């Protein structure tokens, strides 16, 4: 601001004279403008870091690990869930000999209050435990129809570490055990706000749908232009078995009456195939018995020839001259002539000598 000088008598303000700029000072504003432009260009090319204007209050941490004996598809599904949930932690595989309540101690060591544990049995059946450590409750599911991100190759995509929206079927509010599972899934799959590893964006949605007494999981990308949904993956289906009061055990709060174990399912399939085989064998035995039975000859029915029209008799032509024999050219070629016989005799004599 320009300096002002006040007169003593009149009290009027008179602007002070500005000092003259030298040639050195005249070049400084141009240099400052160039520096400002360079700084703007650098800021344009620079990727801004994550914006965090609040405080991280929700300290939910999820432990995701499995037992030994899982196949490659289960391992890929576990890696996909860890990638989609930035608030998750990993651990080494658990031995089959260890009891399930040992997982509560592992959660305490890892400073986690929720757990997703994949339990493999017979190298073909996969079970998922969702637990609130250490006081419970916990739920056990049978995992079916697994499709991983690498297997699906969908067109959707989302930013790594972004926070998802959770969409639930209205049927979750109808029954009390589904309401409990809804709250359970919200606490596990929702990324806490202002988490250090999360990004302040919402660009995908997790959907939980109830169909055929099962929970179907899908992951969709939210497109900014028209708010359309494009599937990303992975996919899996959770078949509820039991809900326990404690963590990995305790009194049973709910048991699914529609659940059928994989062993029983395989047994039913084997019994169906065995019944089909027995039916085929019985049909073959009946056919053999019918072939051995004597055939019953029915008497001729005179009414069967009522609508039969006799054919017209054609005149018979008698040949008085003997027909000429047909010449077989192939037989003539095969015939051995006199000169051929002589050549064969000479060859046989020469070989004998």
Curated annotation (Swiss-Prot):
Residue ranges of the region described as Disordered: 1-50, 334-353
Gene Ontology terms describing biological process: rRNA processing
Modified residues (N6-acetyllysine): 276
UniProt cross-references to Pfam families, sorted A to Z: Brix
Record key words, sorted: Acetylation, Isopeptide bond, Nucleus, Phosphoprotein, Ribosome biogenesis, Ubl conjugation
Superkingdom of the source species: Eukaryota
Predominant cellular place of this UniProt entry's protein: nucleus
Every Brix domain range: 60-249
Compositional bias segments (type: Basic and acidic residues): 34-47
One GO cellular component term noted in the UniProt record for this chain: nucleolus
Keyword Signal: no
Modified residues (Phosphoserine): 261
Localization: Nucleus, Nucleolus
UniProt feature, compositional bias: Basic residues: 334-344
The keyword Secreted belongs to this UniProt entry's keyword annotation: no
SMART domains: Brix
GO function terms (MF aspect): rRNA binding
Positions of crosslink type Glycyl lysine isopeptide (Lys-Gly) (interchain with G-Cter in SUMO2): 160, 314, 322
Family: Belongs to the BRX1 family.
Main function: Required for biogenesis of the 60S ribosomal subunit.
Listed name of the protein: Ribosome biogenesis protein BRX1 homolog
Record organism: Mus musculus
